[in-house]
Regions:
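Positively charged, low-complexity terminal tracts
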Residues: 1-78
Length: 78
């Protein structure tokens, strides 16, 4: 583990910055915090990953439950 207390294991999705002045872009990553089991993580990152915004880390089951609820609320399909 590195001195940053996290390790990005896999980058799944990177969304573009909303406008030219944004410092951070949102990413969905598989990440390990403090050597603990991998979680799905959504947060903003600087281009070089030296800085991050507050975000949320979820287990697979938590992620599925939240995605399902969001799709149902918006009228989407699973």
């Amino acid at each position: 583990m590195n001195d940053k207390n996290y390790e990005i294991k896999e980058k799944i999705l990177s969304l573009p910055k909303e406008n030219e002045t944004d410092v951070y872009h949102k990413e969905l990553n598989v990440i390990s915090w403090y050597g603990k089991p991998d979680k799905l993580d959504i947060r903003g990152w600087s281009d070089d990953h030296s800085k991050m915004t507050k975000g949320i880390s979820l287990s697979k089951d938590e992620f599925i439950e939240i995605a399902r609820a969001g799709l149902e609320k918006l009228g989407g399909k699973e």
